[in-house]
């Protein structure tokens, strides 16, 4: 049996709440208390697991009544979200982040399994075959942005 680390457990917990609702509003300290971790652990989970590349929008409000709101979004159906994702990608995207974008498109039923696998092969380090990592990430970004723009205008 494979053990899970606390970040995986917190992520699974938040995703289970999101499965029943369009969004979740949490108080960082309450979730930290629930899992007996420091609040910065909750920040880490949210910053690394609930990114726009993964199909989530996160809004936080600081202060006494502060909260963190996490919303699962369909990357292609919302032009503003798509624009934000393209802006985040910018001129460069790592293989890991690009895989997360493709996974989100697959989970949103924008891509079928075969299409997602073909894209993953096309943006893979071995396929691109470049020794310059910056150039590789730049080329990968251009491919992903091209796909996203095509999906935007597909009927």
Swiss-Prot record:
GO terms for molecular function: DNA binding. It comes from the Bacteria. Keywords: DNA-binding, Repressor, Transcription, Transcription regulation. Transmembrane segments: none annotated. InterPro entries: CtsR, CtsR_C, CtsR_C_sf, CtsR_N, CtsR_N_sf. One of its GO terms (biological process) is regulation of DNA-templated transcription. Disruption phenotype: Disruption leads to increased expression of ftsH, indicating CtsR is a transcriptional repressor. Binds to the ftsH promoter region, leading to repression of its expression. Belongs to the CtsR family. Homodimer. This is Transcriptional regulator CtsR. It comes from Lactiplantibacillus plantarum (strain ATCC BAA-793 / NCIMB 8826 / WCFS1) (Lactobacillus plantarum). The gene is ctsR.
């Amino acid at each position: 049996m494979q053990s899970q680390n606390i970040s995986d457990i917190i992520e699974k917990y938040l995703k289970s709440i999101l499965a029943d609702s369009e969004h979740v509003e949490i108080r960082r300290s309450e979730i930290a208390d629930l899992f007996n971790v420091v609040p910065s652990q909750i920040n880490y989970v949210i910053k690394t697991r609930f990114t726009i590349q993964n199909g989530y929008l996160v809004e936080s409000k600081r202060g006494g009544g502060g909260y963190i709101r996490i919303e699962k979004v369909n990357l292609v159906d919302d032009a503003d979200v798509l624009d934000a994702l393209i802006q985040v990608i910018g001129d460069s995207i790592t293989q890991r982040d690009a895989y997360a974008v493709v996974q989100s498109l697959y989970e949103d039923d924008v891509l079928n399994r075969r299409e997602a696998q073909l894209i993953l092969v096309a943006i893979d380090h071995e396929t691109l075959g470049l020794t310059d990592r910056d150039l590789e990430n730049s080329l990968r970004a251009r491919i992903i942005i091209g796909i996203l723009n095509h999906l935007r205008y597909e009927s």
